[in-house]
Design a protein with these regions (language model features):
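Generic alpha-helical transmembrane segments of integral inner-membrane proteins
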Residues: 62, 66, 70, 74, ...
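Small-residue-rich hydrophobic transmembrane alpha-helices
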Residues: 87-147, 191-210, 322-388, 420-441
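Transmembrane alpha-helix boundary and packing residues in multipass membrane permease domains
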Residues: 61, 65, 76-77, 94, ...
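Short alpha-helical transmembrane segments in multi-pass integral membrane proteins
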Residues: 2-58, 115-187, 237-293, 350-415, ...
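Short runs within selected transmembrane alpha-helices of multi-pass transporters and secretion channels
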Residues: 108, 183-203, 210-218, 243-258, ...
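N-terminal transmembrane alpha-helices
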Residues: 45-77, 81-82, 95-114, 142-146, ...
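Transmembrane helical elements of multi-pass membrane transporters/channels
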Residues: 56-75, 183, 194, 217, ...
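Helix-terminus/linker motif at the lipid-water interface of multi-pass membrane proteins
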Residues: 66, 70-88, 157-171, 227-238, ...
Length: 507
């Protein structure tokens, strides 16, 4: 159930309506235009101080994610210059990396819920324990991922190579994917540990250091990609293996920067004092994080596997679709970071407000951040749609692949405002610890609706991929409607670390 008290639900677009009954029993509606604007402005538009605060949180994340996505784009172009088989092989390997990355995000989210609220409550001892939890769970998940990816790499990669096309091309893609994947495994642990530190720092309100660490990583990745892929500075040309090695080096650099700099500034990040003095995490706190975090971990695992399953289903329409999806997703990610980054602001702002006991402030801020994100997403969607054909020309690949990629980008661009709504709603619901609701809203939606719907389009219709892909994107408007209802209910706005739960969080 999205909300438990219908009487308390106030629609986002409330109107000033006065009803007067005439002699004939007809209702006369008088709507004040100025009243509508006043309510709209109060609900969705903040003052200068609000936007200054929001941008101070969002801009470093936007810079971090934009630079990361831009360098990923350059990597993508470099690998694409080696050939379509190289590009597609790396793409399918990165689908598996995507599942790992998102699973790490989900594993850290449970601790992040409490971390943000402990930061709001200034309880730094238990905040430190949430960081210990993040580090331990990251190591465990990394070990499981390495076990799976070293045990069944061929079987997993082959799932994406079942579409129509030359068997020789399919074999080449598999070979390049295996070369890339085997080296990428060495970068899993540094990535997981750096995400543990960065997420804790962000929960404490520190977004600049994670941004700087990422900037170091992406520029390291860019330089080593150019040198190792093409064999510059006297080094051998390693192709896709060079791309993987560059990524591993960059992830190690990111971890070293964020960890070393943070520990050298413990006067600012005093919650790091005694971090490794013991591995103690309060029993009840561990239980609560697991209760809140396990649904998030399962959610992210199911969501990411659902997304790659949809990609696999679409890829059965032909090998050209694999390369086209990779190009399209690279650019939609680059454009999307501008509004997806608002999710970080929603998580921090609402989490700290809830931790400080101000649920009404948390509710008010979500609507303003969501409206801001939607406006940004709409503008970026128009820009992406206009530039899609030009963008694909930078790739040295077949005309069919470029044409499909442009069509995919235009379809995604139309749905960006809806994605922005769902993204902000996800982080708002998560900030209040409504993890089962988060799971229903996210991964269950993907598996109950999106995957079967995409499968039905591919299997039971005679439509081409040019029609199937836009139709598959209709998942986003429906999810946006669900998101508005969920956020409007206010059921998510809970203080998890206040006086009522304080005893439950201590040993």
């Amino acid at each position: 159930m999205w909300y438990s008290d219908l009487d308390s639900f106030e629609p986002a677009f409330a109107l000033d309506v006065q009803l007067a009954n005439g002699k004939a029993g007809k209702a006369v509606h008088s709507v004040s235009a100025s009243g509508i604007w006043t309510r709209f402005r109060n609900r969705f538009i903040g003052d200068r101080a609000f936007y200054k605060m929001a941008l101070s949180l969002v801009v470093p994340v936007i810079i971090q994610n934009t630079v990361t996505s831009f360098v990923n784009l350059l990597d993508n172009v470099m690998v694409g210059n080696l050939g379509t088989a190289h590009l597609s092989g790396v793409a399918i390997a990165n689908h598996l990396m995507f599942v790992f990355n998102v699973t790490i995000f989900g594993a850290l989210s449970g601790a992040g819920i409490y971390g943000a609220q402990f930061a709001g409550a200034k309880d730094w001892q238990r905040f430190r324990e949430t960081l210990r939890f993040r580090l331990l769970v990251s190591v465990i998940i990394t070990a499981l991922a390495i076990f799976i990816l070293t045990g069944w790499p061929v079987q997993l990669l082959s799932l994406y190579l079942q579409g129509e096309g030359d068997p020789a091309d399919s074999a080449a893609m598999l070979n390049f994917g295996l070369q890339y994947l085997r080296i990428m495994l060495w970068g899993l642990l540094p990535f997981a540990l750096s995400q543990s530190y960065s997420s804790a720092l962000r929960d404490a309100g520190e977004t600049v250091l994670p941004m700087r660490a990422t900037l170091v990583a992406v520029f390291t990745n860019l330089v080593f990609n150019y040198v190792l892929i093409f064999g510059k500075l006297g080094l051998p040309a390693l192709g896709v293996q060079g791309a993987a090695l560059a990524t591993v080096i960059s992830r190690l650099a990111e971890f070293l920067v964020v960890a070393v700099v943070a520990h050298k500034n413990m006067d600012r990040f005093f919650f790091l004092n005694g971090l490794y003095r013991s591995l103690r995490i309060g029993r009840d706190l561990t239980k609560n994080i697991m209760l809140k975090g396990m649904p998030l971990l399962v959610n992210e695992l199911l969501w990411s596997s659902g997304m790659v399953t949809m990609t696999q289903i679409l890829s059965t329409k032909g090998l050209a679709v694999v390369g086209a999806l990779n190009i399209a997703q690279t650019f939609t990610t680059l454009f999307g970071v501008f509004f997806f980054s608002f999710g970080t602001a929603v998580a921090i702002v609402t989490g700290q407000a809830l931790g400080a006991g101000d649920g009404e402030l948390a509710k008010a801020q979500v609507w303003k951040l969501m409206f801001f994100a939607v406006a940004v997403a709409g503008a970026l969607g128009v820009l992406l749609s206009i530039s899609a054909d030009w963008i694909t020309q930078i790739y040295r690949t077949e005309a069919e692949v470029r044409s499909l990629a442009a069509a995919f980008m235009r379809a995604t661009a139309l749905c960006m405002p809806f994605q922005a709504i769902a993204n902000c709603a996800y982080f708002a619901i998560r900030s209040g610890g409504r993890t089962l609701l988060t799971m229903a809203f996210d991964s269950i939606y993907v598996w109950v609706f999106c995957v079967p719907y995409t499968y039905a389009l591919v299997t039971f219709t005679a439509l081409g991929i040019e029609s199937i892909y836009p139709l598959s994107q209709l998942q986003h408007p429906l999810k946006a409607v669900i998101s508005l209802v969920a956020v409007g209910s206010g059921i998510w706005a809970r203080n998890l670390v206040g006086e009522k739960t304080e005893s439950a969080l201590t040993d």
